[in-house]
């Protein structure tokens, strides 16, 4: 296995990571901004409210999108385990 194939696998891993992290991150940012605006308008200064709601939203988004998000992760893991014997031949 050459260095370029390892770099290719690393870049594919980063893309899969971005695919996994973006939906919960976007949902958390939107909910956090919405709750922040509501708290500023009503002058409620409770710190646990935004954290609890964001946590529930992130868990819900991961639960809803897990089947869709798992496909690239499973493909990458299959590719890595298939190519692993070729990676270790020279060592």
Curated annotation (Swiss-Prot):
Function recorded in the entry: Could be involved in the secretion of an unknown factor.
A GO cellular-component term linked to this record: plasma membrane
Origin species: Sinorhizobium fredii (strain NBRC 101917 / NGR234)
GO BP: any one term: protein secretion
Protein name, as recorded: Probable translocation protein y4yM
Coiled-coil intervals: none
Pfam families: Bac_export_3, ECF-ribofla_trS
Keyword Membrane: yes
Residue ranges of the TM segments: 15-35, 55-75
Family statement drawn from the similarity comment of this UniProt entry: Belongs to the FliQ/MopD/SpaQ family.
Keyword Heme: no
Topology relative to the membrane: Multi-pass membrane protein
PANTHER family assigned to the protein according to its UniProt record, in alphabetical order: FLAGELLAR BIOSYNTHETIC PROTEIN FLIQ, SURFACE PRESENTATION OF ANTIGENS PROTEIN SPAQ
Signal peptide from the UniProt entry: none
Annotated localization: Cell membrane
Keywords, ordered alphabetically: Cell membrane, Membrane, Plasmid, Transmembrane, Transmembrane helix, Transport
